[in-house]
Every structure is written in C-alpha cells, then in structure tokens.
Amino acid sequence: LNLPPELDKAQADIDAVVLQKEDASRHQKFEEAANLRDQEKKLRAKREKMLEEWRKKRDEKRIVVDEDEMLHIVADWTGVPLNRMEKKETQKLLDLETDLQGSVIGQERACEVIARALRRSRADLKDPRRPIGSFLFLGPTGVGKTLLARTLAERMFGEKEAIIQIDMSEYMEKFTVSRMIGSPPGYVGHDEGGQLTEQVRRKPYSVVLFDEIEKAHPDVIQLLLQALEDGRLTDSLGRVVDFRNTIIIMTSNVGADVLQRNNSVGFDVGVDSTRDYEKLKERIMDETKRAFKPEFLNRLTDIIIFQQLAKTHMTKIVDIEVDKVAKRLLDLGVKLVVNEAARGYLVDNGWDEKYGARPLRRAVERLLEDPLAEAILRDDYN
C-alpha cells in the first residue's frame, strides 16, 4: 500500500517519540516519559485522522473495473463478442428481421429467410460441426447484398468490423488459390499464413463475405467445401482454423438477367406472391446450377434471391442517406433540414432501375454533400 508522504512523516514522528519515551523510562525520568506518552497519543490520533481522510479521498477517486469492462477487454483480446450480451440472445434472434429490414430496404423476403436460418442454427438444430450459416446471395448490382452482410455482422456479433470481406476477382487464376490458406513451404509469404485462414483465426466470430464468387477459380470452390462441410480449414503452417462460429456469405450476379427480364412477370416489386417468387427462383436456380457444381450448392444453408429495387424503395433509402449526412453535420454543430421536395429531387436524379441504389448514393454526394462542403468551408450557413 503506497501511502502519501504526509502519513509517512507522521509515522516517523511517532517512532521518534516512542524511542525518546523508552529512553526516558530506562533512565527513570518518569515525568518526561509521561509527557512523551501523552505526545505519542496526540500524534497517533492526528495520524489516524489523516489516514481516514486519505482513504475517503482515495475511495472517491477509485476506478472500479466492473463486469462489462472485463467483457470488453476479453472481447478485444480474443475477438469473441462478449461485450454485447446485455440483450438476450434469444430476443436478438427473434427481432433479427426487424433489425435487418430497418437498414436493408426492399429486401424483406431475403431478411426473413436469413433470420429463419440463423434461428434454426442457434436453436441447436444444425450440425454442430458446420458454420452458423452459409448463404449464396443472388441478385443484380446495387440491391443490398453486401449491405445485408455488413448489417448482419453488426447485429449478430456486435460491431461493424466483425466482417471479413474477400473480393474473389483477386482469385481468378490458379496460382492465386494458395493465398487463401498460405503459400507452401519454400515460397514467398509462407510464414504469413493465408489471407482467409489468418483473418478467421484472429476473428473467429465474424461474417466471412466472398464477393462475386462466380469469378473465383474452380479450385477456390473446392477449397471452401471443407469449410462449409466440416467447419474448418488447415493453413500452410499446419494450424486448424475453426469456421464453426462464422457466417459464410457468397454474393453473385448469376441470374441477374433473369430478374431484369422478369420484372413484370411475378417478380415486380408490387407482386409479393410466394407462388410467383418460387417460379422465378426455379428459373434462377437453373442458371445457378449451370454456374456452380452440385456438391457446392448442396452444402449451403440457403440460396437467397434479392429483388430489384423500385422507386418507392428509393424514397426510404434517401431518408437513410440524408439522416447519415445530418448526423455527421450535427457533430460539427450544424443542423440540416431537407424537405420532401428536395428528397424527391434526389430520388428523381438518383433513380436507375438497372443499377440499383448506387446511383442514388452518388446523387446524394453530388447534390447534397458537395454544396454543403462548400458552404461549410466558406462559413456560409446559418
């Protein structure tokens, strides 16, 4: 226990008086010894008071490490998301559709399918050797496939960074396949581990996103079969990497042309018939079976089809994008108000059925963020 210098000095004064008292007693100076005894009592009382005041101040400044902080530290060290367990896991899974649909607009059916699959998984109805879930997202560009994966990572594992994204256009050649699990002995990069296995080893609780899986070399698919079936991969250093606590998602544009051609035949946004959806899914699955091998498709938890976005969906997406800009401006002390006419103007200039929501984001940047940036730099705002 480290005491302040004042208390150490008070104890030293007491020790000195005690020595003087004992010396006086030995020399039979009883009157002097009695005076020193009274002085010792006063010094001890003074020191006790100082000690009590010091303890009181120390307790007021004491830093308490509680359970939540310990969970946060362990989560940072291990990558296991312990610090978001304040909400019951069961309730989080029951509310998963609502949470996902609040961020991913126009894909209610996709959100429902993935939520049902994850509930089956967490209810111990899945094979414990396999990942939590493995999904193939099919649909045209700009409809929210990657956004759903990112949102799912945040909702399931408590942070936006709980996603490992791998662009499969980097693995189109045969010689690039080894980079997934690491270069063999004697080759450059052998000691670094694989670009996939090393990230999963460091973050075992995460969403693993393989973007545009149809571009990957066939040997990459063969490599992934073990992760999908057995929930593990062995890297070039001989370490077994556990995939059982991951959610594996692969995105693809296979069948996107079918969606565009059939927008008016059962897959229009205004039509929500399960029968029409199943018909279109059957046609898209024919395309998918031509692109991927049966042993790969059989190992997936589910294949999820994303519909094209309608103009009504764009209104909701504009609201989300404008709210993001308003929140950033609020941090700068600026309040942004965008009326309905301006929001409609953004939709009209950013709506493109073929390219989905991405042109809308560029419209928000061009028509809203650019003028705001210039006004802030010129200090030309109220």
Segments (PLM) and residue ranges:
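AAA+ P-loop NTPase nucleotide-binding core of proteostasis motors
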Residues: 1-382
